[in-house]
Amino acid sequence: MTIMNGFELHYLSFVYAQEFSSKNNNLGGQMKHIIALASKIAFTLALLYVILDRVYHASFLSVMFIALFLGFVSYLSGDMLVLPRTNNITASLADFGLSFVILWVFVLTQTRNDFSPFGAALLSAACLTVFEYFFHRYLLKNVLDENFRNELSARDNTLQYQTEAADELFPETKEKHKE
């Protein structure tokens, strides 16, 4: 029986981890999305708790429900549909609009109206948009696969300018000049 030193043990664990990840490559991609979604919901809950519960006195259960709903909807629509087809700024603005509308309806229906629901929704959506900008950067760097990142960078860096050349609609002919 031989005793392994730290380097050999680290190397063997690295080799086994590589074999496991190559066999379960799809599982690793799914796990990245689950971790990203869970962190998004957790941060959304923390942010909405501070703004809506502490400042505007909404119930914690309502804030937790809206954080779950908003997290799922914005992850599926903004992060998985809009972000891959556009850029970070456009996806963040789309998330702002979506979260503003959802939060405005929530604040109108679930809280006491001794404050401006528009202001509460606007403040919450603006804070969430700042978080979304950095979250999108994280998604592009760590969660979305490398092929997608290469396609995105190639698409953004190769501008294709096109011009159109055509003849005139009614060209002047020599016969018309003689008249």
UniProtKB/Swiss-Prot annotation:
The chain crosses the membrane at residues 33-53, 63-83, 89-109, 115-135. Coiled coil: none annotated. Keywords: Cell membrane, Membrane, Transmembrane, Transmembrane helix. It is found in: Cell membrane. It comes from the Bacteria. InterPro entries: DUF2512 (IPR019649). One of its GO terms (cellular component) is plasma membrane. It is a multi-pass membrane protein. This is Uncharacterized membrane protein YndM. The gene is yndM.
